[in-house]
Amino acid sequence: QGASWVITEYCGKHYMEQMRLHNTEPHRTFPTLETGDRFWKDYDIEASVRMFNTKWGNAGIGFCAQNSLNMLVFMFEDKQVKLVYRHKENVEELESKAFDYNSDDTYILNVSVNGSHVECYVNGTKYIDIDTVYAVQGGKAAITATIPAAFGYINVNVDEKTDERIKAKREEYSNKCTEAQSRYPKM
Protein backbone atom coordinates (compact mmCIF):
# COMPACT_ATOMS: atom_id res chain seq x y z
CA GLN A 1 0.00 0.00 0.00
CA GLY A 2 2.96 2.34 0.19
CA ALA A 3 4.00 4.86 2.79
CA SER A 4 1.41 6.27 5.17
CA TRP A 5 3.21 9.57 5.75
CA VAL A 6 5.37 11.73 3.50
CA ILE A 7 6.80 15.24 3.72
CA THR A 8 5.68 17.42 0.81
CA GLU A 9 6.33 21.00 -0.24
CA TYR A 10 4.01 23.50 -1.87
CA CYS A 11 4.93 27.15 -2.54
CA GLY A 12 7.91 26.88 -0.19
CA LYS A 13 5.91 25.47 2.74
CA HIS A 14 6.35 21.91 4.01
CA TYR A 15 3.50 19.60 5.00
CA MET A 16 3.15 16.22 6.66
CA GLU A 17 0.75 14.26 4.47
CA GLN A 18 -1.09 11.06 5.23
CA MET A 19 -1.32 9.26 1.88
CA ARG A 20 -3.17 5.98 2.44
CA LEU A 21 -6.55 5.62 0.77
CA HIS A 22 -7.96 2.62 2.63
CA ASN A 23 -7.04 1.50 6.13
CA THR A 24 -9.43 -1.38 6.78
CA GLU A 25 -7.53 -4.42 5.45
CA PRO A 26 -6.56 -6.73 7.07
CA HIS A 27 -7.90 -4.75 10.05
CA ARG A 28 -8.82 -1.19 10.94
CA THR A 29 -5.81 1.11 11.34
CA PHE A 30 -5.28 4.74 12.32
CA PRO A 31 -2.17 6.28 10.69
CA THR A 32 -0.67 8.55 13.34
CA LEU A 33 2.43 10.67 13.94
CA GLU A 34 3.12 11.25 17.65
CA THR A 35 5.34 13.48 19.75
CA GLY A 36 5.98 13.75 23.46
CA ASP A 37 5.78 11.14 26.18
CA ARG A 38 3.44 9.61 28.75
CA PHE A 39 4.21 12.36 31.27
CA TRP A 40 2.68 15.17 29.18
CA LYS A 41 -0.45 16.55 30.86
CA ASP A 42 -2.57 19.69 30.90
CA TYR A 43 -1.50 21.10 27.55
CA ASP A 44 -2.86 22.93 24.52
CA ILE A 45 -2.40 21.34 21.10
CA GLU A 46 -2.98 23.10 17.79
CA ALA A 47 -2.56 21.90 14.21
CA SER A 48 -3.55 22.97 10.73
CA VAL A 49 -5.15 20.39 8.45
CA ARG A 50 -6.49 20.27 4.92
CA MET A 51 -8.33 17.15 3.84
CA PHE A 52 -8.13 15.93 0.24
CA ASN A 53 -11.20 13.72 0.58
CA THR A 54 -14.40 14.54 2.47
CA LYS A 55 -16.65 11.63 1.43
CA TRP A 56 -15.37 9.13 4.02
CA GLY A 57 -12.68 8.77 6.68
CA ASN A 58 -11.37 11.26 9.21
CA ALA A 59 -8.52 13.64 10.03
CA GLY A 60 -7.63 15.42 13.25
CA ILE A 61 -5.41 15.72 16.30
CA GLY A 62 -4.80 13.12 18.95
CA PHE A 63 -3.98 13.82 22.56
CA CYS A 64 -3.64 12.08 25.92
CA ALA A 65 -2.16 9.31 23.79
CA GLN A 66 -0.47 6.27 25.25
CA ASN A 67 0.12 5.00 21.71
CA SER A 68 -1.63 5.09 18.32
CA LEU A 69 -4.26 2.64 19.59
CA ASN A 70 -5.13 4.41 22.85
CA MET A 71 -5.91 8.13 22.62
CA LEU A 72 -8.48 10.88 22.48
CA VAL A 73 -8.99 12.37 19.01
CA PHE A 74 -10.66 15.61 17.91
CA MET A 75 -11.45 15.09 14.24
CA PHE A 76 -13.49 15.79 11.17
CA GLU A 77 -15.71 12.89 10.08
CA ASP A 78 -19.12 12.51 8.42
CA LYS A 79 -19.62 16.31 8.13
CA GLN A 80 -19.13 16.68 11.88
CA VAL A 81 -16.39 17.53 14.34
CA LYS A 82 -16.10 14.73 16.86
CA LEU A 83 -14.31 13.99 20.08
CA VAL A 84 -13.69 10.24 20.25
CA TYR A 85 -11.77 7.80 22.39
CA ARG A 86 -9.86 5.22 20.35
CA HIS A 87 -8.85 2.00 22.04
CA LYS A 88 -7.44 -0.61 19.68
CA GLU A 89 -10.02 -0.97 16.88
CA ASN A 90 -12.89 0.41 18.99
CA VAL A 91 -13.94 4.04 18.67
CA GLU A 92 -16.21 5.57 21.33
CA GLU A 93 -17.81 8.86 20.30
CA LEU A 94 -17.90 11.20 23.30
CA GLU A 95 -19.48 14.22 21.60
CA SER A 96 -20.04 15.63 18.12
CA LYS A 97 -21.36 18.72 16.37
CA ALA A 98 -22.37 19.36 12.76
CA PHE A 99 -19.61 21.00 10.70
CA ASP A 100 -19.67 21.44 6.93
CA TYR A 101 -15.97 21.10 6.05
CA ASN A 102 -14.53 20.87 2.54
CA SER A 103 -11.30 19.98 0.75
CA ASP A 104 -10.57 23.55 -0.38
CA ASP A 105 -9.93 25.09 3.03
CA THR A 106 -7.29 24.60 5.71
CA TYR A 107 -8.67 24.34 9.24
CA ILE A 108 -6.98 25.15 12.54
CA LEU A 109 -7.83 22.56 15.20
CA ASN A 110 -7.12 23.38 18.84
CA VAL A 111 -7.63 21.32 21.98
CA SER A 112 -7.06 22.48 25.54
CA VAL A 113 -6.71 19.76 28.21
CA ASN A 114 -6.76 20.52 31.94
CA GLY A 115 -7.20 17.46 34.14
CA SER A 116 -10.40 15.79 32.92
CA HIS A 117 -11.63 18.94 31.18
CA VAL A 118 -11.31 19.12 27.37
CA GLU A 119 -12.22 22.05 25.10
CA CYS A 120 -12.10 21.62 21.31
CA TYR A 121 -12.00 24.45 18.75
CA VAL A 122 -12.02 24.87 14.98
CA ASN A 123 -10.68 28.18 13.65
CA GLY A 124 -11.05 29.74 17.11
CA THR A 125 -14.70 28.71 17.68
CA LYS A 126 -15.43 26.30 20.52
CA TYR A 127 -17.43 23.24 19.44
CA ILE A 128 -16.91 20.78 22.29
CA ASP A 129 -16.57 21.37 26.04
CA ILE A 130 -16.56 18.14 28.05
CA ASP A 131 -15.18 16.37 31.09
CA THR A 132 -13.85 12.86 30.47
CA VAL A 133 -11.89 10.40 32.56
CA TYR A 134 -9.88 9.53 29.43
CA ALA A 135 -8.07 12.89 29.61
CA VAL A 136 -6.78 12.47 33.17
CA GLN A 137 -3.96 10.09 32.23
CA GLY A 138 -2.32 12.63 29.92
CA GLY A 139 0.08 11.43 27.24
CA LYS A 140 1.51 12.21 23.84
CA ALA A 141 0.14 14.56 21.19
CA ALA A 142 -0.47 13.45 17.61
CA ILE A 143 -1.79 14.12 14.14
CA THR A 144 -3.91 11.37 12.64
CA ALA A 145 -5.88 10.72 9.47
CA THR A 146 -7.52 7.79 7.70
CA ILE A 147 -7.82 9.80 4.48
CA PRO A 148 -5.31 11.75 2.42
CA ALA A 149 -4.73 14.96 4.39
CA ALA A 150 -1.98 17.59 4.79
CA PHE A 151 -0.93 18.94 8.18
CA GLY A 152 0.97 22.23 8.00
CA TYR A 153 2.11 22.43 11.62
CA ILE A 154 1.51 21.13 15.11
CA ASN A 155 2.17 23.11 18.30
CA VAL A 156 1.95 21.84 21.88
CA ASN A 157 2.17 24.35 24.74
CA VAL A 158 2.16 24.20 28.55
CA ASP A 159 2.64 26.84 31.21
CA GLU A 160 5.88 26.95 33.25
CA LYS A 161 4.40 25.29 36.33
CA THR A 162 3.07 22.38 34.27
CA ASP A 163 6.41 22.08 32.46
CA GLU A 164 8.21 21.80 35.81
CA ARG A 165 5.71 19.17 37.00
CA ILE A 166 6.19 17.12 33.81
CA LYS A 167 9.99 17.28 34.12
CA ALA A 168 9.82 16.20 37.78
CA LYS A 169 7.61 13.19 36.93
CA ARG A 170 9.94 12.20 34.08
CA GLU A 171 13.00 12.45 36.36
CA GLU A 172 11.25 10.48 39.12
CA TYR A 173 10.48 7.70 36.64
CA SER A 174 14.05 7.73 35.29
CA ASN A 175 15.43 7.41 38.83
CA LYS A 176 13.13 4.45 39.56
CA CYS A 177 14.28 2.74 36.36
CA THR A 178 17.96 3.36 37.18
CA GLU A 179 17.45 1.94 40.68
CA ALA A 180 15.66 -1.15 39.36
CA GLN A 181 18.34 -1.73 36.72
CA SER A 182 21.15 -1.39 39.27
CA ARG A 183 19.96 -4.63 40.91
CA TYR A 184 20.84 -6.45 37.68
CA PRO A 185 24.32 -5.14 36.77
CA LYS A 186 25.06 -7.82 34.16
CA MET A 187 22.04 -7.03 32.01
Task: List the predicted regions and their residue ranges.
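Extracellular glycan-recognition surfaces and repeat-rich motifs
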Residues: 1-29, 177-184
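Beta-strand-rich interaction surfaces with strong enrichment in secreted/lumenal proteins
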Residues: 30-38, 61, 95-101, 130-131, ...
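Flexible glycan-contacting loops in extracellular carbohydrate-active proteins
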Residues: 130-155
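Activation corresponds to long, low-complexity, non-globular regions
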Residues: 163-187
